[in-house]
């Protein structure tokens, strides 16, 4: 990944890089790979994430009009 530094503004370029990495899920992936996760634990975590996603989607879904 590349971020160009314009006008010697390194801080701005660093913030831009961090934002890009955040949107790609880089930091989340690093946290997941820090320690080994057993397949059973991984399966359970994925199920919980999917359930959480379903609940969140249901909360923000527009009610059907009959």
From Swiss-Prot:
GO molecular function: structural constituent of ribosome
GO cellular component: ribonucleoprotein complex; ribosome
Keyword tags: Ribonucleoprotein, Ribosomal protein
One GO process term, biological-process aspect: translation
Record bears the keyword Lipid metabolism: no
Highest taxon above the source species: Bacteria
Signal sequence range: none
Disordered: annotated span: 34-66
Coiled-coil regions listed: none
Residue ranges with Basic residues bias: 34-46
Family that this chain belongs to: Belongs to the bacterial ribosomal protein bS21 family.
Protein name per the record: Small ribosomal subunit protein bS21A
Organism of this sequence: Geobacter sulfurreducens (strain ATCC 51573 / DSM 12127 / PCA)
Gene name in the database record: rpsU1
């Amino acid at each position: 990944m590349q971020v160009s530094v314009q006008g010697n503004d390194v801080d701005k370029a660093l913030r831009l890089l961090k934002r890009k990495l955040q949107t790609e899920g880089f930091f989340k992936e690093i946290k997941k790979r820090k320690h080994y996760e057993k397949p059973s634990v991984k399966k359970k975590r994925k199920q919980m994430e999917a359930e959480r996603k379903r609940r969140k989607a249901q909360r923000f879904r527009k009610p059907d009009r009959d």
